[in-house]
């Protein structure tokens, strides 16, 4: 079961201008509301697609392995999100799923962030157990599909709400951080995948001079 999401640690959206909430631990919480149908960016088709697709594939091949398959999106809103699948191997005994397309457009990073331009583009990834069921048929079951759903949902999130996602941001599954599918997880935490992959993998410098940061999507309990 997947709910509308809100972000902790992200900039406020254009549709929500209230003062942010502060948790007892000092974290900032921003809530995002649906926009009117006329202004809803979800109704916009991508103006550009697959800007860095080839460079991302080359980056994955260089530092991890060549993707075994790409789950191509048929119908896209805002940005075209594909998911690259690297199957388990001796070096990496787990499934690796990585987005491409989130970085097609820059995110709206707050001006107070130092070197903000280096955080404007990102892609997301998740690592799954070797016995995880992956495939078009298997994804008909939400218990198998939810990691891919959240990769794609979060990849669109900053573009939909004119905000950004980055290091340490947490995104709950709805206002109450409800359980996701058949798990006890209720939130997603974004961190650089530095424990699983080479440090040089964490950042891709594109041919046009931009920087794409890779963040691991880590499910956490409420």
Give names to the regions the model predicted:
Residues 2-222:
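Short linear motifs embedded in intrinsically disordered, proline/glycine-rich low-complexity segments
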């Amino acid at each position: 079961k997947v709910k509308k999401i809100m972000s902790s640690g992200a900039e406020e959206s254009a549709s929500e201008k209230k003062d942010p909430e502060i948790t007892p631990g000092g974290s900032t919480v921003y809530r995002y509301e649906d926009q009117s149908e006329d202004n809803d960016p979800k109704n916009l088709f991508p103006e550009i697609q697959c800007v860095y697709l080839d460079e991302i594939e080359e980056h994955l091949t260089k530092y991890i392995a060549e993707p075994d398959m790409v789950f191509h999106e048929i119908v896209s809103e805002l940005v075209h999100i594909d998911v690259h699948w690297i199957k388990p191997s001796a070096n990496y005994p787990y499934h690796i799923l990585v987005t491409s397309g989130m970085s097609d457009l820059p995110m709206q990073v707050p001006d107070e962030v130092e070197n903000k331009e280096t955080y404007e583009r990102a892609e997301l990834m998740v690592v799954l157990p070797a016995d995880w069921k992956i495939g078009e048929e298997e994804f008909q079951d939400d218990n198998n599909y939810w990691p891919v759903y959240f990769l794609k949902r979060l990849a669109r999130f900053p573009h939909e709400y004119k905000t950004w996602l980055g290091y340490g941001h947490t995104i709950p599954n709805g206002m109450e951080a409800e359980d996701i599918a058949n798990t006890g997880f209720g939130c997603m935490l974004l961190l650089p995948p530095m424990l699983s992959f080479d440090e040089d993998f964490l950042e891709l410098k594109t041919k046009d001079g931009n920087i794409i940061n890779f963040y691991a999507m880590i499910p956490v309990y409420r």
